Amino acid sequence: MSLDVVVVMDPIASIKIAKDTTFAMLLEAQRRGHRLHYVRPGGLSLREGRAVAQVAPLSVREDKTSWFTLGEFAELAFGPGQVVLMRKDPPVDAEFVYDTQVLSVAQRAGAQIVNDPQGLRDYNEKLAALLFPQCCPPTLVSRDAAALKAFVLEHGQAVLKPLDGMGGRSIFRSGSGDPNLNVILETLTDGNRKLTLAQRFIPDITAGDKRILLVDGLPVDYCLARIPQGDEFRGNLAAGGRGEGRPLSERDRWIAAQVGPEMRRRGMRFVGLDVIGDYLTEVNVTSPTCVRELDAQFGLNIAGLLFDAIEAGAAQ
């Protein structure tokens, strides 16, 4: 079965192919004989009630100096026999939401969207973990700086995050006795106007912030522990963390079993769970990463698992 695979992503010319999960997906789709189409950034539209996109034929190759070739752009109407990989990075701002609404129209026309556009709108990556409270550390989400401060003082040390960030940006560790706590909370809440997440600090972060990948609700057998370096407490690779592959622990599998069935039910075929120690901290649904690192360390083909699920869905 040959499919038209349409990718919505950040500019392909700027990716780092050694680490880019979307690139791994494109390589696998091409290997299977599917036709690749690249959506011009900002190229999704609605025309007379139909979802359309400005796309160009795309070919990819494992060459760090010349990894893609594009043909001429033309308008494509979405419909059956198409798979759309929605792989734009956060922030999930108004333009991102509008794109998911266009993709919902494409879905109704018969295209398969990965991940489900309604799910992308519903699941904030920081808040989605709280749908599984049995998996999470003590957490408070509030605009009230005084309440957030009381939470920090109650737990001694806490991590403070905005709800719309990625890659470890604007994440603070603070605690009782920190002279900067008030200004951190003023900044994150924008004077009690923006929801901010406070989470009890988990000392196990020194052993790594684990990324567990779910494909169609089932966990990959290995995770990537992103280990903070030096005096940094953030393990994110974008913040300088070192990636180390590990087999899943029993607790990791338990967490995956709590989250996976709901993700599959909602059409979230490719999801990244962030786990520190025994606790789930985030559920990443927009553009989860770490496929390339895990494939390289363990000889896996995680994108192959994803396309097995996609092809099974297309055959129904």
UniProtKB/Swiss-Prot annotation:
Cofactor annotation: Mg(2+); Mn(2+)
Cystine pairings recorded for this chain: none
Keywords: ATP-binding, Glutathione biosynthesis, Ligase, Magnesium, Manganese, Metal-binding, Nucleotide-binding
Gene source species: Xanthomonas axonopodis pv. citri (strain 306)
Manganese keyword on record: yes
Pfam families: GSH-S_ATP, GSH-S_N
Molecular function terms from GO: ATP binding; glutathione synthase activity; metal ion binding
Enzyme class: ligase
Pathway of action: Sulfur metabolism; glutathione biosynthesis; glutathione from L-cysteine and L-glutamate: step 2/2
Name of this protein: Glutathione synthetase
Family designation: Belongs to the prokaryotic GSH synthase family.
